[in-house]
C-alpha cells in the first residue's frame, strides 16, 4: 500500500481558538507569519487548513461556498466553464466600449467574480471534498490554452501552485527550484504565470531563460504568446506590435500617428493607458539579464546547461535582478529534470540542495534564496490520473476511469517498477529512466555508469533499498559524550536529531568501553570485532568558510561475538567549529566501540591527539609495511600516507571489492550498507580528485583496517644449495669414480 509523503496537513500547528479569533476579524495577513512560523497565502484575512509541503508550512484560505458542479458526489470534479456566448465574440476592450451600458451592466458581476477568483483563488467540490486552488492555478485551468486545449486538473499541480504562492508571499524567498519529471507541465504552468502576472503589472519586465536560446524562443512563441492571445478581453491589456511577436510581448499603448488632417483639424489622439510591461527571452549565458530589473524570471530546463554555460554562475547574476538592496522585488520560477552530472546536472544538484528550507542563514534565507520542491513521478505520470485529478498509486480492485476517459486497471507504482525491471540489464538506460521519471531525489540525480569507477548498478540498488520506508528507522543520529563530562572515563552515546554521528549498531553493554592497559599504553579490546577508518583535517577554520569535512567510518569483520559481520555501522561526516571537537569525537567513538583506527597521517594532529592522551595503541600502523621499515613519524603516531600510488590503488580496490560483495542485491538478499551519503560519494568517486571525497577515503580505510592481513608484505623464500664438503661417487661398474 503506497503511503504518500509529499505533503501533510497540520491540524494542531496553530490552536483552533487562535485561528477562530483572528478569522473573526479578518486579521491574518498575506505573507510570512513569524509568530506561528507559517506562510499565509490567504488574501481574505481568514485561514483554514495548514499544509506542510517539503518542510514549508503554508496556511490556506478558509473555504466558503465551494462551487459544486453537481449534487452527486461522483459527478463533482473540475470542469472548465466556457465564457458566455455574448462575451465570446468580444476580442478587446475597444469592442467592449462600443456596447451600450445596459449590456455592460448585465456582465459586470461575472467579470468582477473572475477578477476575484484570480486574486483570491477558487474552491470547488472534488469527489465530495472541498478543494482550494490558488488564483494562479485558477487562471491556468480556466483561461490558459495549452497544446491539448484546456489543462486538466491534477492534484500534483494544485500542490505545486500552493507551494509557488507561498514562495511569492514569503518576503525572504526569491522563488522556487523545482526538481521535476518529464511531461509534468512545468513549461505551460510557468508560461501561464508569466502572462497572468504580466497582465496585471505596470512598468515591469518579465524574462525567460532555458538550456539554449532556441528553447527559450520556442517557449515564448509556442506557449506564452498563445496563452496571452486567448485571454478573454477583460483580462487582456492593450498590446503593442504584432499579435504573435517573436522576441517581445509588449503590453503598452502603440505610438499614435499624427496625420496632416489631424493636425489641421486640431484633433487630439485618443488618450489610452497601457501597462508598459514586457515579456521577452534571452540567449543562454552566465550573464543573461545582467543589470536588468525583473519582476518574474522563468528558468526552464535549468538542470541541462552544458559547458561553458553554468546555471550556478547565471543564478548569482540573475538573483541581483530580483532585488533592490535587501528587498526582494521579483521572483524566479525555476524547474527542470536533471541531466547526467557532468552534463549540467551537478550544478543544478548543488543549486537544488542549496535551496533547502530547513537550512537558512541569519537573514532567514536559504543559501540560494530559492525554495526547493520535488514532486515524485507517481503524482503526475500520464495515463494514471483519475477523473478527479488524483493519481492511481496502487493497482485498483476494479478498473478506474482516467481523466482521459480510458480505464486504469493497474497502479502507477507497478507500471514504474515494470519499466525499471525491464532495464536492469541496461545500466545507462535505467539511470536515464530514473532521471526522467524519478520517485526520489536520488533517482533524479542518477549519473551515467560509464563515468564511475565502481559498480553503480549495485550502489543504486542499495540506495533504492535504503529509501524504502521499511529501512528508514535503522539509523540513529546522535553524539558521544564522556560520562559526567570527565575525560578518559566511560563514553556514552546520546541520540540527538542534530548529532554528528549516524549509527546502525552499538555493541552489547559488556563489549562497550573495553580498554586494555599494557606497557603504560591503552589498547582497544575489540580489535577482533572491527575497526575504524578516518580522513581527518588539521585546521579549525578556512578563509572561504568551506574546507573538507572530517570523516569517520566504523566497520565490523567476521567474529564470533554478538556483532554483525562485514557491516558498516557508523558514519561521521562533519566539520565542527574547532578541530579539537573533531579529534575528541573520533577518540570517543574508538573508545566506546573498543576498536582501533587507521587514519591518514598526512594531517597528523588527530594522531598526535591520540598519542598525547595515551591512546597510541588505538592508532594502527600502516598494514603494507613491517614495523622495521616504518619511518620515525609512523612509528611514533601510526597512520597511513595518502600519497603513495600503491596505497591509492589498494584503497580503491578495497572499496570496489566491498561493493561487489556486500552492497546491493547479493545471493542472500540486500546488503547492510545503510549510509546514503557514503553510497552517493562512492557513486561519484574520482580517483584523480580524492580530496573531494572524504566519505570514500575514510570508508576505504575502514575496509583496509578490517582486512589488514591482505596488505602484509610477504618475503620471498629462496632456497640456496650450500656445499657441505662431502665427495660424491658414481658406483656403476666395478670401480667407483668421483663425481666432479
Segments (PLM) and residue ranges:
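Residue-level preference for the first positions of well-ordered beta-strands
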Residues: 175-177, 205-207, 296, 596
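Walker A/P-loop
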Residues: 172-194
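Short alpha-helix plus adjacent loop in nuclease-associated cores
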Residues: 619-665
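RNase H-like, metal-dependent nuclease domains and their acidic two-metal-ion catalytic environment used
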Residues: 2-27, 38, 44, 191, ...
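Substrate-engagement module of ASCE P-loop NTPases
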Residues: 316-329, 335
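Pre-P-loop entry segment of helicase/translocase ATPase cores
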Residues: 2-175, 685
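Post-Walker A helix-loop "phosphate-sensing" segment adjacent to the P-loop in P-loop NTPases
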Residues: 197-204
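Conserved nucleotide-state-sensing and coupling region of NTP-binding domains
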Residues: 205-285, 463-464, 470-474
